Regions:
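Flexible, glycine/threonine-enriched loop-and-boundary segments that flank and lead into catalytic domains
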Residues: 271-292
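Flexible loop/turn segments at secondary-structure boundaries
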Residues: 280-283, 307-308, 317-320, 351-355, ...
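Electropositive, glycine- and tryptophan-enriched low-complexity nucleic-acid-binding patches
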Residues: 286-334
């Protein structure tokens, strides 16, 4: 596949006399050290089959795989949007070196919308490759060993969607506005749009709910449903005269509006956002947040050091135990390059009653049959909770802005890859600090470092 930027050995003539990035930055910086250890060539080889081929004679050359992969890593590692990561890349020479640049660039690497198209091209399998290569790098650096990766902790959490808090009055008004906008866009004249009455009813319902006047609130909601039903039926009648393409485009929104009109508070599988019908309501028993709106995701981490070895979404809000086999299957696939198979899974009581062939499942519901060593491992189960917290606060897992169920799946994998990148940077910084301490001690006589009664024996 042709790439737009030249290789380091093929710099254009106007860049030959510019100072190279490696002469301007600190080569001991953790990001620089990590850029030397990540297997970029293997990553490009793994992702190339999933990308469209670019002919040598026509078409704009594609962006380098290392550039796009590096931007996706940095986006989630530093909790940035697509627009912000491109702007920060322009200002940061370390980020440019990490993504393969040779000299300092003064233009943004790509349009932010290109990252959206690249995510769609990579798909879930391509994002799994990004995550797998962070695990391979940690293993190659000997930050984790095979024995460490064979024991995993598995848990689930909620990846919230970027939607407003769903209320009946707001959803009904949004649906009415959307249908009126679609009719206007395609030249369909409605009998009445209720442009004044609709927003007024929404405000009244909100005021009554705030004052706990629920009988009056329900009266306003009934009126809102009546207005939405009138607009919906009027548009359905006049849609029969339109072209098939117009009917197909508007039919999707008519179906959602009909679903919203028919649902009641106690119904199952309700619609919580007009633009995101895949959103589900989940309760995790949190006092501060009784209900969360998004998708259930599973996280698998190494039992001792907390490296993420599996992350995926589970649409439909399944029982936690029903997700265990799929979660361990994904972890097995991500660990195949390091020749490791998960042998022990440490879980909470939400996974009771489920077994996976070839994997020992440990939870505290087996108290009468557990050995002392197994109990020590079960006490490590809570180690997954701070990992989930950092994923949400530092790597963007707390709010997903990507579209659809595919966006949910891609987002959680990107968050996991970003977390592992931060994990590797911390490991490199720790090794650097440790080496400085060792060098300082080796250059200082033991009599000055330690009291006479504590001198080290060689």
């Amino acid at each position: 596949m042709r790439t737009r930027r030249p290789a380091a050995e093929q710099l254009p003539a106007d860049e030959l006399f510019r100072s190279r990035l490696e002469n301007q930055i600190d080569l001991r910086h953790p990001l620089v050290q990590l850029s030397h250890r990540l297997p970029w060539s293997a990553l490009e080889q793994a992702l190339s089959p999933r990308l469209p081929a670019t002919t040598g004679t026509g078409g704009r050359p594609a962006l380098p795989v290392r550039l796009i992969a590096g931007l996706l890593y940095l986006k989630h590692a530093y909790d940035l949007s697509d627009e912000a990561v491109c702007e920060r890349w322009l200002e940061n020479p370390y980020w440019q070196f990490f993504t393969g640049e040779v000299v300092f660039q003064t233009c943004v690497p790509c349009d932010p919308s290109s990252l959206t198209r690249w995510r769609q091209r990579l798909g879930e399998a391509g994002m799994e490759e990004l995550l797998a290569h962070t695990i391979n790098t940690a293993h190659a650096m000997k930050a984790v060993d095979a024995r460490e990766l064979s024991r995993v902790i598995v848990d689930t959490t909620v990846q919230e969607k970027a939607i407003a808090h769903p209320t009946d009055s707001r959803l009904l008004e949004v649906a009415r506005k959307k249908l009126v906008l679609l009719a206007k866009r395609h030249g369909i004249a409605l009998r009445q749009t209720y442009a004044r009455q609709g927003p007024a009813l929404r405000r009244k319902a909100g005021r009554h709910a705030h004052a706990r006047q629920f009988k009056r609130m329900r009266k306003e909601l009934r009126r809102q449903r009546t207005l939405l039903g009138r607009v919906l039926r009027d548009l359905q009648r006049k849609l029969a005269q339109q072209e098939p393409s117009v009917r197909e485009r508007i039919g999707v929104w008519l179906e959602r509006a009909q679903r919203l009109l028919a649902q009641r508070p106690k119904d199952k599988q309700k619609l919580y956002a007009l633009h995101a019908p895949e959103v589900e309501c989940m309760s995790k028993g949190k006092a501060r947040q009784p209900y969360e709106f998004g998708v259930k995701v599973g996280i698998a981490v190494s039992a001792r050091k907390g490296l993420i070895v599996g992350a995926r979404s589970f649409p439909g809000n399944p029982y936690d135990g029903d997700t265990l086999a799929e979660q361990l299957e994904q972890a097995r696939g991500l660990l195949q390059d390091v020749d490791v198979i998960p042998q022990v899974a440490i879980v909470d009581l939400g996974y009771r009653g489920r077994d996976v062939e070839g994997v020992q499942i440990l939870h505290r519901g087996q108290a009468k049959t557990l050995t002392r060593r197994q109990w020590r491992w079960i006490k490590r189960r809570q180690a997954v909770e701070p990992v989930i917290g950092h994923l949400k606060q530092d790597c963007r897992l707390n709010r997903c802005h990507l579209k659809g169920a595919q966006g949910d799946a891609l987002h959680v994998l990107g968050c996991a890859a970003g977390y592992n990148l931060r994990w590797l940077l911390r490991w490199i910084a720790f090794l650097r600090a440790l080496l400085q301490v060792v060098r300082a001690r080796s250059s200082t006589p033991s009599s000055t470092m330690w009291p006479a009664n504590m001198a080290l024996e060689v």
